[in-house]
Design a protein with these regions (language model features):
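Cysteine-nucleophile amide-bond enzymes
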Residues: 1-170
Length: 170
């Protein structure tokens, strides 16, 4: 799929290479991040800056794989208004439900409310809770929210409500 074929409201799923991205993929599936496209910009929740918008070209410099999915019944104007409403909110580092701020798929599910929550998983091949997540939550001083309701990028991408449009190429 070419950049010029992107439509407002398209979801872009990515595979990042950071340690937390690898832990997310190990626990949940092939994608570690999701963002939404509007007017040549990307809206998403980031570890570094919380909920932000940035130029598509800047976003694309950060990632390797960009798979595009579309929700055909989207009311793009309404979703865009909700997307802007949350700009500046902090990142939800705890992944706990009803926390201040958003993690990436939580933000998308909030502004495009067509996705169900599922019990959150934090395991890997051998452990119910991976070593990475045990250390992550130890540093936060919190219990791992295992089986708490949440979302993840791979789960959103698997929704029957979305249509896969292809891998994004310039």
């Amino acid at each position: 799929m070419k950049i010029q074929d992107l439509q407002d409201g398209d979801l872009i799923f990515t595979v990042r290479s950071s340690e937390i991205a690898a832990a997310i993929r190990a626990a949940t599936g092939s994608y570690s991040h999701v963002a939404i496209f509007f007017n040549g910009e990307i809206y998403h929740a980031t570890h570094e800056n919380g909920v932000v918008n940035q130029d598509l070209s800047d976003f694309l410099q950060d990632e390797d794989v960009y798979d595009v999915y579309r929700y055909p019944a989207i009311d793009a104007d309404a979703v865009f208004k909700r997307a802007k409403l949350h700009l500046g909110k902090p990142y939800n580092f705890s992944f706990y439900p009803q926390s201040d701020g958003f993690y990436c798929s939580e933000y998308i599910a909030e502004i495009l409310p067509v996705f169900d929550t599922i019990p959150m998983q934090f395991g890997d091949e051998g452990n119910l809770i991976s070593d990475f997540w045990q250390e992550y939550y130890r540093e936060l001083g919190l219990d791992v929210p295992l089986n708490q309701p949440g979302t993840n990028p791979s789960q959103l991408a698997q929704s029957s409500k979305l249509i896969y449009k292809g891998e994004l190429h310039d």
